[in-house]
Amino acid sequence: MIQQESFLTVADNSGAKRIQCIRVLGTNRRYAHVGDVIVAAVKDAMPNMGVKKSDVVKAVVVRTKATLRRDTGNSIRFDDNAAVIINDDKNPKGTRVFGPVARELRERNFTKIVSLAPEVI
């Protein structure tokens, strides 16, 4: 579960390395899970890239350490909390996605991120 002040690694090549959650988008939401959109501040970034430190960006959560329970009875858990930076059209800013992503992103209409990911779990 991601909440305000949570740090996430960035799983794309947009230029940011770490982001900190500012707000979970939605009506009075406290926690974000896989597939939820958050507003975040860039805390660590690579130089000469598209995203700079202290930029405020939107991102979609693609991996969480918290257990994700599926309707089939399976549960899945990742090693880190990760997000992909997106623009207002819900398209990723980067051109590559690193690491596995959850299948729930396809149900939330983030098909571009799913197609860029090397593995969908």
Curated annotation (Swiss-Prot):
Signal peptide: none
Keyword terms, alphabetized: Ribonucleoprotein, Ribosomal protein, RNA-binding, rRNA-binding
Bilayer-crossing regions: none
Matching InterPro entries: Ribosomal_uL14, Ribosomal_uL14_bac-type, Ribosomal_uL14_sf
Entry GO MF terms: large ribosomal subunit rRNA binding; structural constituent of ribosome
Keyword RNA-binding: yes
GO biological process, one term: translation
GO cellular component: cytosolic large ribosomal subunit
Chain's role: Binds to 23S rRNA. Forms part of two intersubunit bridges in the 70S ribosome.
Family label: Belongs to the universal ribosomal protein uL14 family.
NCBIfam families with a match to the protein in the record: rplN_bact (TIGR01067)
Record note on quaternary structure: Part of the 50S ribosomal subunit. Forms a cluster with proteins L3 and L19. In the 70S ribosome, L14 and L19 interact and together make contacts with the 16S rRNA in bridges B5 and B8.
UniProt protein name: Large ribosomal subunit protein uL14
Source taxonomy: Bacteria, Bacillati, Cyanobacteriota, Cyanophyceae, Synechococcales
